Structures are given as C-alpha cells and as structure tokens.
C-alpha cells in the first residue's frame, strides 16, 4: 500500500478512537481538568480512580450492571438453544430457499425497534413479563435470533456433508448425528454465536428503556445519568459497558471464521 493509504488509515483510526479517548479523560481524570474545561487535544493532567470507584460503589449502578449481565447471558443461551435447530434445519434445505428464509428472519431487524417494542410492551404488561429479566431477554432475542441463525447456518454449511452421511450409513439417527458429529465440529461457531448475541444484548437500548424502565440496564442508566448532568458517573459506567465489548471483539476474531459468514450468504 502507498504512503497515502497508510496516512488515511491512521487518520481514520484516530477519528474512531477519539471518542474512547474523551471517555478515558472524563472517567479517569479529576473533574477540574475535564468537566470544567475539556479541550479537543488535551493530555491527561492527572489520573484518578475516584470516578470509577464511586460508580462501582453505587448500588444502583451495580444492580444495573448485574441486570445487564444476566439479560445478556440469557439472550446468548437462548440464541444458541434456538439458533442451532433453526440453522441446522435450514442447512438441509436447498441453498436458495435457506437464503430466502434467512432474509425473512432478518426482516424484524429491518424495522425500527420502537415499532416492535410498543406492542410487545403492551402484551408483556398483560402477561406479567413487563420489567422482568425474562421478558427483556425474550424481546431482545428478536434481534439476536436472526443473527445467530445466520452465523450458525454458515457454520453448519461449512461442515463436510460426507461426515454426516457416513454417520447415517453407520446407523446413527438424526439426533445422534447432530449431537455426536455436527455440534462438536461446530463448537467454535457456537461460541462465536453466543458472544455475538451477548454483545447485541449488552448494549441494547430501545427494548430496555421501554420494557424495563423501573429496573434499568446499563445503557438505560447511562442515558438517565447523562440527561441529569451526572457526566462523571455516566463516563465511568460507559467505560464498564465498553470494556467487555473490546475483550469479546478480540475473542470473536479467534472463533468467527470467514466461511461461517460466507456460508450464510450462499444462494
């Protein structure tokens, strides 16, 4: 690549990382250096853990973090549990038909989330699921399931069909073939699916603010603190919200292979 391309990449990376740098300033630098006077090219004048310690010792913030963690983990597990049979069934269909059905599954993600969230909130209020962990997880699964099915479809399509055929010839039934042959080979893709779904839930906002207003998750609480002018606590919470995503992004590079994504696009 030419020097101009390298310069362009450096500028792009700096542009993308600058918001994280400002977040670092507000979260770790004493307030007198940030809230009162924050400059675009400012260097950290001092480092303090006071803001982060204050956020982590706040019971409301701890409760929101635990709620986000619980909901995200539940969404990840549901995505795997529902995505495996969905994607495995799709992998047995002709590729064009599987692609068409996958596109239909993504239709829910194409609509504005608030269009779906309002009728769900009304239904959950009647079912006793409003402002509950399970209710919020089920709603967020509408977003996560198409993604998990898409990734797992690519995973199953990347497994050689000869292995399944040989197992069937040896007398293995459908479920035995799935659990003893297919799933062990797909474990990395399943792990990637769980992580992707977990991340989708971890920072999801629209369903959380409409379906869990009394017991908010981290994104909702950050919004509330920001609108009330509590920027230091909001910055510390944003840092807590961002850190797992950065770690999981690195892990996804290990588990998510190119053929998994490519497989879901065949047809």
Model-flagged regions — what are they?
Residues 3-5, 153-161, 165, 174, ...:
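C-terminal transmembrane helix and the adjacent membrane-cytosol boundary/short C-terminal tail
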